[in-house]
Amino acid sequence: ILDCTLRDGGHINNWNFSDICVRETLRACENSAVEYFEAGYNMPQCIKKSNVKLVIMVDAKNICSVSKNADCVRLACYPHQISEALDALEEYKNQGFEVFLHLMTADKFEDYERLKNWKNKDILTSIYFADSFGAFMPVDVERIYKKLQDCGFENISFHAHNNLQLAFANTIKAIELGAYSVDATVFGMGRGGGNLPIELLLKYLGKDYSHYLELIRKYYIDLYNKYGWGYSYDALVGGLANIHPSKVSQTIV
Protein backbone atom coordinates (compact mmCIF):
# COMPACT_ATOMS: atom_id res chain seq x y z
CA ILE A 1 0.00 0.00 0.00
CA LEU A 2 1.12 3.56 -0.73
CA ASP A 3 -0.41 6.32 1.40
CA CYS A 4 -0.60 9.36 -0.90
CA THR A 5 -2.66 11.58 1.41
CA LEU A 6 -0.17 14.42 1.72
CA ARG A 7 0.53 14.56 -2.00
CA ASP A 8 -2.82 13.86 -3.69
CA GLY A 9 -5.02 14.92 -0.80
CA GLY A 10 -3.02 18.12 -0.65
CA HIS A 11 -4.74 19.34 -3.82
CA ILE A 12 -7.74 19.96 -1.55
CA ASN A 13 -6.07 22.27 0.99
CA ASN A 14 -3.14 23.54 -1.09
CA TRP A 15 -0.85 21.22 0.92
CA ASN A 16 -1.47 23.27 4.05
CA PHE A 17 -1.11 20.48 6.62
CA SER A 18 0.13 21.30 10.10
CA ASP A 19 3.41 19.72 11.15
CA ILE A 20 1.66 17.66 13.81
CA CYS A 21 -0.86 16.35 11.26
CA VAL A 22 2.00 15.41 8.91
CA ARG A 23 3.92 13.61 11.64
CA GLU A 24 0.89 11.76 12.94
CA THR A 25 -0.21 10.74 9.44
CA LEU A 26 3.23 9.24 8.95
CA ARG A 27 3.00 7.57 12.35
CA ALA A 28 -0.34 5.97 11.45
CA CYS A 29 1.26 4.68 8.26
CA GLU A 30 4.19 3.25 10.22
CA ASN A 31 1.92 1.56 12.76
CA SER A 32 -0.41 0.02 10.17
CA ALA A 33 2.06 -2.01 8.08
CA VAL A 34 1.70 0.39 5.14
CA GLU A 35 4.83 0.09 3.03
CA TYR A 36 5.11 3.50 1.29
CA PHE A 37 4.35 7.07 2.37
CA GLU A 38 4.23 9.78 -0.28
CA ALA A 39 5.34 12.97 1.44
CA GLY A 40 4.38 15.30 -1.41
CA TYR A 41 6.18 17.08 -4.23
CA ASN A 42 8.72 18.29 -1.66
CA MET A 43 9.85 16.71 1.58
CA PRO A 44 8.24 18.46 4.59
CA GLN A 45 10.89 19.75 6.99
CA CYS A 46 9.23 17.91 9.87
CA ILE A 47 9.95 14.54 8.21
CA LYS A 48 13.45 13.16 8.41
CA LYS A 49 13.51 9.38 8.21
CA SER A 50 11.02 6.60 8.77
CA ASN A 51 10.70 2.83 8.91
CA VAL A 52 8.39 3.06 5.89
CA LYS A 53 9.73 4.14 2.52
CA LEU A 54 9.34 7.87 1.87
CA VAL A 55 8.26 8.83 -1.63
CA ILE A 56 8.47 12.15 -3.47
CA MET A 57 6.47 12.71 -6.66
CA VAL A 58 8.16 14.57 -9.51
CA ASP A 59 6.20 15.84 -12.50
CA ALA A 60 7.74 15.19 -15.91
CA LYS A 61 7.24 18.85 -16.84
CA ASN A 62 9.25 19.96 -13.80
CA ILE A 63 12.23 17.63 -13.31
CA CYS A 64 14.02 18.75 -10.16
CA SER A 65 16.36 17.65 -7.41
CA VAL A 66 14.91 15.47 -4.64
CA SER A 67 15.69 15.49 -0.92
CA LYS A 68 18.13 12.81 0.17
CA ASN A 69 15.69 12.05 2.99
CA ALA A 70 13.48 10.41 0.37
CA ASP A 71 13.83 6.74 -0.46
CA CYS A 72 11.84 6.75 -3.70
CA VAL A 73 10.93 9.00 -6.61
CA ARG A 74 7.61 8.55 -8.37
CA LEU A 75 7.78 10.28 -11.75
CA ALA A 76 4.38 11.27 -13.10
CA CYS A 77 3.88 11.81 -16.80
CA TYR A 78 1.15 12.23 -19.35
CA PRO A 79 1.33 10.05 -22.48
CA HIS A 80 3.13 12.72 -24.54
CA GLN A 81 5.88 13.04 -21.90
CA ILE A 82 6.99 9.42 -21.83
CA SER A 83 10.43 9.92 -23.41
CA GLU A 84 11.44 12.65 -20.96
CA ALA A 85 10.10 10.58 -18.09
CA LEU A 86 12.14 7.49 -18.95
CA ASP A 87 15.33 9.54 -19.24
CA ALA A 88 14.70 11.22 -15.89
CA LEU A 89 13.97 7.90 -14.17
CA GLU A 90 17.37 6.60 -15.19
CA GLU A 91 19.02 9.69 -13.69
CA TYR A 92 17.13 9.38 -10.40
CA LYS A 93 18.04 5.70 -10.23
CA ASN A 94 21.70 6.61 -10.69
CA GLN A 95 21.34 8.96 -7.71
CA GLY A 96 20.37 6.01 -5.52
CA PHE A 97 16.57 6.34 -5.35
CA GLU A 98 14.03 3.62 -5.89
CA VAL A 99 12.02 4.76 -8.91
CA PHE A 100 8.41 4.41 -10.01
CA LEU A 101 6.92 5.44 -13.34
CA HIS A 102 3.42 6.87 -12.88
CA LEU A 103 1.31 6.97 -16.07
CA MET A 104 -1.42 9.60 -15.75
CA THR A 105 -4.56 9.30 -17.89
CA ALA A 106 -3.41 5.75 -18.56
CA ASP A 107 -6.45 4.95 -20.68
CA LYS A 108 -5.24 7.52 -23.21
CA PHE A 109 -1.75 6.03 -23.46
CA GLU A 110 -1.07 4.41 -26.84
CA ASP A 111 2.71 4.13 -27.24
CA TYR A 112 3.02 0.68 -25.66
CA GLU A 113 5.68 -0.17 -28.22
CA ARG A 114 7.89 2.51 -26.65
CA LEU A 115 7.49 0.87 -23.24
CA LYS A 116 7.96 -2.61 -24.65
CA ASN A 117 11.23 -1.62 -26.28
CA TRP A 118 12.58 0.27 -23.26
CA LYS A 119 15.62 -1.72 -22.20
CA ASN A 120 15.90 -0.41 -18.64
CA LYS A 121 12.66 -1.73 -17.17
CA ASP A 122 14.64 -3.40 -14.41
CA ILE A 123 15.45 -0.02 -12.80
CA LEU A 124 11.79 0.37 -11.81
CA THR A 125 10.43 -0.80 -8.51
CA SER A 126 7.04 -0.65 -10.25
CA ILE A 127 5.09 1.01 -13.04
CA TYR A 128 1.89 2.73 -11.94
CA PHE A 129 -1.14 3.42 -14.07
CA ALA A 130 -3.67 6.00 -12.91
CA ASP A 131 -7.39 6.44 -13.37
CA SER A 132 -6.77 10.16 -13.33
CA PHE A 133 -10.37 11.32 -13.74
CA GLY A 134 -12.14 8.48 -11.94
CA ALA A 135 -13.65 7.05 -15.12
CA PHE A 136 -12.48 3.43 -15.04
CA MET A 137 -14.55 0.30 -14.67
CA PRO A 138 -12.88 -2.91 -13.42
CA VAL A 139 -12.70 -4.13 -17.02
CA ASP A 140 -10.54 -1.08 -17.86
CA VAL A 141 -8.18 -1.90 -15.00
CA GLU A 142 -7.76 -5.43 -16.31
CA ARG A 143 -7.25 -4.28 -19.91
CA ILE A 144 -4.50 -1.78 -19.08
CA TYR A 145 -2.87 -4.10 -16.54
CA LYS A 146 -2.56 -6.82 -19.17
CA LYS A 147 -1.19 -4.38 -21.75
CA LEU A 148 1.57 -3.44 -19.33
CA GLN A 149 2.24 -7.12 -18.66
CA ASP A 150 2.54 -7.65 -22.41
CA CYS A 151 5.17 -4.90 -22.45
CA GLY A 152 7.29 -6.97 -20.08
CA PHE A 153 6.57 -5.25 -16.75
CA GLU A 154 6.34 -7.57 -13.76
CA ASN A 155 5.57 -5.12 -10.93
CA ILE A 156 2.45 -3.16 -11.86
CA SER A 157 0.64 -0.77 -9.51
CA PHE A 158 -2.62 1.17 -9.59
CA HIS A 159 -3.89 4.61 -8.51
CA ALA A 160 -7.67 5.05 -8.30
CA HIS A 161 -10.01 8.03 -8.10
CA ASN A 162 -13.54 7.73 -6.81
CA ASN A 163 -15.69 9.90 -9.09
CA LEU A 164 -17.97 6.98 -10.01
CA GLN A 165 -17.62 5.36 -6.56
CA LEU A 166 -15.57 2.58 -8.16
CA ALA A 167 -12.16 3.24 -6.58
CA PHE A 168 -12.60 0.27 -4.22
CA ALA A 169 -13.88 -2.11 -6.91
CA ASN A 170 -11.12 -1.07 -9.31
CA THR A 171 -8.44 -1.44 -6.65
CA ILE A 172 -9.72 -4.89 -5.69
CA LYS A 173 -9.49 -5.86 -9.36
CA ALA A 174 -5.86 -4.65 -9.46
CA ILE A 175 -5.09 -6.63 -6.30
CA GLU A 176 -6.68 -9.75 -7.79
CA LEU A 177 -4.52 -9.31 -10.89
CA GLY A 178 -1.42 -9.28 -8.67
CA ALA A 179 -0.69 -5.56 -8.26
CA TYR A 180 2.62 -4.70 -6.61
CA SER A 181 1.12 -1.69 -4.83
CA VAL A 182 -2.11 0.31 -4.70
CA ASP A 183 -2.73 3.89 -3.57
CA ALA A 184 -5.12 5.25 -0.96
CA THR A 185 -5.62 8.33 1.22
CA VAL A 186 -6.88 9.05 4.71
CA PHE A 187 -10.70 9.33 4.68
CA GLY A 188 -10.52 9.29 0.86
CA MET A 189 -9.11 12.84 0.82
CA GLY A 190 -8.62 13.96 -2.76
CA ARG A 191 -9.72 16.23 -5.54
CA GLY A 192 -12.99 15.62 -7.38
CA GLY A 193 -14.63 12.44 -6.14
CA GLY A 194 -11.73 11.77 -3.82
CA ASN A 195 -9.50 8.72 -3.56
CA LEU A 196 -9.79 5.24 -2.12
CA PRO A 197 -10.06 5.52 1.71
CA ILE A 198 -7.01 3.82 3.18
CA GLU A 199 -8.86 2.73 6.30
CA LEU A 200 -11.29 0.69 4.15
CA LEU A 201 -8.45 -0.87 2.19
CA LEU A 202 -6.72 -1.91 5.41
CA LYS A 203 -9.95 -3.50 6.65
CA TYR A 204 -10.33 -5.40 3.36
CA LEU A 205 -6.75 -6.67 3.56
CA GLY A 206 -7.09 -7.74 7.19
CA LYS A 207 -4.64 -5.13 8.49
CA ASP A 208 -4.87 -2.90 11.55
CA TYR A 209 -6.85 0.23 10.67
CA SER A 210 -7.30 1.56 14.22
CA HIS A 211 -4.43 4.06 13.96
CA TYR A 212 -6.05 5.66 10.93
CA LEU A 213 -9.42 5.89 12.68
CA GLU A 214 -7.78 7.83 15.50
CA LEU A 215 -6.02 10.04 12.94
CA ILE A 216 -9.31 10.76 11.15
CA ARG A 217 -10.98 11.69 14.42
CA LYS A 218 -8.14 14.03 15.45
CA TYR A 219 -7.43 15.81 12.16
CA TYR A 220 -9.24 14.71 9.03
CA ILE A 221 -12.87 15.19 10.09
CA ASP A 222 -12.04 18.86 10.61
CA LEU A 223 -10.32 19.01 7.22
CA TYR A 224 -13.32 17.33 5.61
CA ASN A 225 -15.75 19.76 7.23
CA LYS A 226 -13.62 22.72 6.13
CA TYR A 227 -12.79 21.72 2.55
CA GLY A 228 -15.13 18.89 1.57
CA TRP A 229 -14.44 16.15 -0.96
CA GLY A 230 -16.13 13.05 -2.27
CA TYR A 231 -19.17 12.22 -4.34
CA SER A 232 -20.91 15.19 -5.93
CA TYR A 233 -22.61 16.10 -9.16
CA ASP A 234 -19.42 17.65 -10.55
CA ALA A 235 -17.40 14.57 -9.58
CA LEU A 236 -19.97 12.35 -11.26
CA VAL A 237 -19.89 14.38 -14.48
CA GLY A 238 -16.08 14.39 -14.47
CA GLY A 239 -16.02 10.61 -14.17
CA LEU A 240 -18.70 10.01 -16.79
CA ALA A 241 -17.01 12.34 -19.27
CA ASN A 242 -13.46 11.29 -18.28
CA ILE A 243 -12.28 14.88 -17.94
CA HIS A 244 -10.23 16.98 -15.55
CA PRO A 245 -12.22 18.53 -12.66
CA SER A 246 -11.42 22.03 -13.95
CA LYS A 247 -13.38 21.33 -17.16
CA VAL A 248 -16.55 19.97 -15.57
CA SER A 249 -18.41 23.29 -15.58
CA GLN A 250 -18.05 23.44 -19.38
CA THR A 251 -19.44 19.94 -19.94
CA ILE A 252 -22.88 18.51 -20.54
CA VAL A 253 -23.06 14.71 -20.34
Predicted regions and their residues:
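Catalytic cores and adjacent flexible loops of soluble metabolic enzymes
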Residues: I1-V253
